[in-house]
């Protein structure tokens, strides 16, 4: 349950740019505290990383570190990142990449004390082109300064932010764990022997899969321009005698239709027609295009609008096709739709449920430099760039805040690791009126669970709401298949099998959609706090599951906000 904050060396090496491989100097690293100035030899770091020997100078800094911290620091110093110079260059020249560099450059400065923006970028690109590859030690060789100056004030502020977030997250999870115990004690006992078997078992339906390219030739932008959008979509159709409820799965940034194929197959076996669109502009193909120089941005700003419109368009097309296509005719119930989304897909699901973009909140939270703690703001703040080149920018932004993209066919949603805090805020999320699950992981460094999921849950006003928190969960645990990520992830499956979490998620998703789409009340016990709490006894990964948060905790959130 505890969030690990790396010690001094780990902080500098691994956290300064939230997962981006940093460059720390050529011959020495300098940092000051009050009137004192300290330095650390890069040669000493190299010897330690390659041979494990700690010099007397390095020992001054490492004597208070635990052995596991030292081992982690040594690994990060020598770990090679599989990124080509073209890929790293393309990302660092994108708007999001430059925002990250500016933020990192405030902390990692040149010898003269200037922002390290250009020096870091040059060093990373040159190191990626070196035969030795992009490692921290190799990057040091290319940093265009004899030394690097660490802005100690920024460093201590960063460490304080991390410590505060760690404390708040641990306190929140402890309260949620206690709340789950309280809720379980007030619920009627669940006789597990009388429940349907959902774990490690496919459902009774056979199914067929087809891929259809849906072409929207009339996609309108905020400015009124028209474009064509091709949405490759996998459809998993159960062989059922009655029309099947529909579940849409929306992938995250840089992922694709394969990311949750395991979930789609399982849901289809339980009688759901599963629709998995691939969002052009924020999928793996967009990421590959960026990294090979064929695109300039991680994703177009318009994806914030186009993603939910993709789902609505595909649902419209399926409804039309079901009237004439023998494969679909009489097979789907397009008025009973659920949406499951992860990360950017979680945002998509919440928009379809009725959440609205909160321009006022974004103006309060979005700064010129990225937040080094909450990297998800890089995505959320892109909403402020929508229409920025138009003379009617202010009016377009106002239109965006009033834009209602809810699809009323959507009756229930599950949002995994969604971005929420600034893009929606309380005003945007409180508009949702349908059943919602918000789920996250305590070890998520991309969308911090305290800000992006726990806080978001507290803002929901819908009666049917659920919060699930994995005590060791990361941002990527439930993603299967090959997913393109730009930056090396700090989330590692070290001592746990992600397959266990996916099996539990399959079972929960099936029960949730059976209850709210198929209206089969016998599945309600699976959604009880007591059932989930009982399941924790047999699993290495604990999931804390609640329907509400205690009033005193909510009051604390209001004070922080």
Label each residue range with its predicted role.
Residues 252, 341-349:
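Gly/Ala-rich beta-loop-alpha elbow adjacent to hydrolase catalytic centers
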Residues 184-242:
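N-terminal cap/lid segment of alpha/beta-hydrolase-fold proteins
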Residues 49-192:
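Mature extracellular/secreted ectodomains of secretory-pathway proteins
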Residues 243-252:
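Short beta-strand element of the alpha/beta-hydrolase
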Residues 254, 258-261, 266, 275-309, ...:
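Cap/lid segment of the alpha/beta-hydrolase catalytic domain
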